[in-house]
Regions:
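Short beta-strand/loop motif that positions the catalytic acidic residue
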Residues: 114-117, 121
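A conserved short beta-strand
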Residues: 85-97
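Flexible "cap/lid" loop of the alpha/beta hydrolase fold
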Residues: 18-27, 95-113
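Short beta-strand immediately N-terminal to the catalytic nucleophile in serine-hydrolase-like folds
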Residues: 66-68, 93, 116
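Active-site signature of alpha/beta-hydrolase-fold catalytic machinery across serine-
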Residues: 78-82
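Serine-hydrolase catalytic machinery in alpha/beta-hydrolase-like enzymes
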Residues: 2-59, 63
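C-terminal catalytic histidine-bearing segment of alpha/beta-hydrolase fold enzymes
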Residues: 130-174
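Gly/Ala-rich beta-loop-alpha elbow adjacent to hydrolase catalytic centers
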Residues: 68-72, 76
Length: 174
């Protein structure tokens, strides 16, 4: 028996364009410098959260799966690739790489990654999954991708099933 934990935290701010949601940075501000700066702040918050979880549950990074949707996917990729300790794997839904040059410079690890995106996503265009896949492959990260037909900016049942299978395989759960 080994301890495992699945992290999927909400953003630390109420969503500016969807009051029932959360965000890591303000979605209404379309400014690259702002987004990069806010992503760095969010990384600090997430890393503190993860360290606290590891301490509270006496769990290793190698038994932690990072998962996220939209901005959460973006943050999961950033955290996983830049952390000094390697996480078990990453599952990302409908996201993208925020700053490829910065991430490439700071990359320390490359856990196996699954990216899932809808072909009808009106918020984060599906082309982002292809760019992310290319980036991850060029940076020696094992990546699997799945584009789901007629799927907008949400997580359908098919995506949840694929993610569960991927997580179970990586955590060696039968």
């Amino acid at each position: 028996y080994k301890r495992q934990i699945f992290l999927c935290p909400n953003g630390h701010q109420r969503c500016s364009i969807n009051p029932s949601g959360y965000q890591w940075f303000d979605l209404s501000i379309d400014d690259e410098k702002y987004i990069k700066a806010e992503a760095v702040k969010a990384e600090i918050i997430l890393n503190k959260f993860i360290e606290q979880v590891k301490k509270n549950y006496n769990i290793l990074s190698s038994n932690i799966v990072l998962c996220g949707f939209s901005q959460g996917c973006m943050m999961a990729i950033n955290i996983a690739l830049t952390n000094r300790e390697k996480f078990n794997c990453v599952v990302g839904f409908s996201g993208k790489i925020i700053d490829k040059d910065d991430l490439e410079r700071r990359k320390k690890n490359g856990p196996e990654t699954l990216l899932i995106h809808g072909d009808a996503d009106e918020v984060v265009p599906v082309s982002n999954i292809l760019e992310a896949k290319d980036f991850l492959i060029r940076n020696n990260v094992s990546v699997n991708t799945k584009i789901i037909k007629n799927c907008g900016h949400h997580i359908p049942i098919e995506a949840s099933s694929l993610a569960l299978h991927f997580i179970k395989k990586n955590l060696e759960i039968k």
